[in-house]
C-alpha cells in the first residue's frame, strides 16, 4: 500500500484585520472541508510548504537537491467555512499565496 499521507490545502493568505495583517499565522483552505466542525480532525496536524530553491543543499542521509520545506502546525479553525489557521517555523513567503500546502495525517489524535 503506497498512498499519500497528506491532504491537499491551499495557502489563502495571512491572518488579518481590516487594516493590519499578521504574517505569523497562515490561513489554509483544506480540500473537502467545508464546515467548521469538520476542521477539528486537523487540529495539531503537521503541515509543510514544499518548494524548489535555486541552489542545492545537503539533507542528512540524502543527496544534495533543490527541494526545501517549511514545517508548521494547524492550530485552530478560522471562520465557519472550513478554513484553518496554521503557524509555521518561519513565516511563509508571500509568493506562496495560492500554492499547495501539504497537511499531514499525523500525529493522530484518535
Curated annotation (Swiss-Prot):
Any GO MF annotation of the entry: tRNA binding
Known role: Component of the large ribosomal subunit. The ribosome is a large ribonucleoprotein complex responsible for the synthesis of proteins in the cell.
Family designation: Belongs to the eukaryotic ribosomal protein eL33 family.
Keyword annotations of the record: Cytoplasm, Ribonucleoprotein, Ribosomal protein, RNA-binding, tRNA-binding
UniProt protein name: Large ribosomal subunit protein eL33
Domain of life: Eukaryota
Gene Ontology CC terms: cytosolic large ribosomal subunit
A biological process term (GO) from this entry: cytoplasmic translation
UniProt-listed Pfam families: Ribosomal_L35Ae
Subcellular location as annotated: Cytoplasm
Organism: Xenopus laevis
HAMAP family: Ribosomal_eL33
Subunit structure: Component of the large ribosomal subunit.
Amino acid at each position: 500500500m503506497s498512498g499519500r499521507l497528506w491532504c491537499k490545502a491551499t495557502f489563502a493568505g495571512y491572518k488579518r484585520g481590516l487594516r493590519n495583517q499578521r504574517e505569523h499565522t497562515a490561513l489554509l483552505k483544506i480540500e473537502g472541508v467545508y464546515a467548521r466542525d469538520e476542521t477539528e480532525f486537523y487540529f495539531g496536524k503537521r503541515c509543510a510548504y514544499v518548494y524548489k530553491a535555486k541552489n542545492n543543499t545537503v539533507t542528512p542521509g540524502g543527496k544534495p537537491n533543490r527541494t526545501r520545506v517549511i514545517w508548521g502546525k494547524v492550530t485552530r479553525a478560522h471562520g465557519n467555512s472550513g478554513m484553518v489557521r496554521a503557524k509555521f517555523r518561519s513565516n511563509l513567503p508571500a509568493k506562496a499565496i495560492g500554492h499547495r500546502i501539504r497537511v499531514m495525517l499525523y500525529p493522530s489524535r484518535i
